[in-house]
Amino acid sequence: GSKANNDGVLDMAKKSIVLLKNDKNLLPLKKSGQKIALIGALANDKNSPLGSWRLAADDNSAVSVLEGMQQYKDNKLTYEKGADLTIEKATFLNELVFNTTDRSGFDAAKKVAANADVVVMVLGENGFQTGEARSRTNLDLPGLQQELLEEIYKVNPNIVLVLNNGRPLALPWAAKNIPTIVE
């Protein structure tokens, strides 16, 4: 696309972000002097933000949350995946198989969370989960994400939950316990 089109899309994306709650005033993040743990496979995903309804977007052409947060160099940012969302690489044609067993990254994620002032967790759906013929039987966080969220909360409750999803999600535990949620 042209620069004008790209600028317009960026403006729409910025305006589509909704602050659902900010009970501890964790947002806005400080521009300097803050230790931030960034956790979640979707935080380093350049494809899912494009969604499955994109027409001509190049794969992996979005700016990931990790890349965006790295722009603020006066904070100490540490990233840990915590757990893979899917077992195999997701594509439009593949059936998505979610990771429900590999918790090997939980300890590293808990360690960085325990040493942070604030934890930003990017959770939700893979971009290829929504779209034609992509119905779900429940609206919970897929894979191990709910378990990861609860484990991180035990070591640091100062969590900003950033949701990446193409449909409503059922998040009763997060709504009750997580102080800041952005969608």
State what each model feature region is.
Residues 3, 7-183:
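C-terminal non-catalytic regions of proteins with extracellular/luminal or membrane-system context
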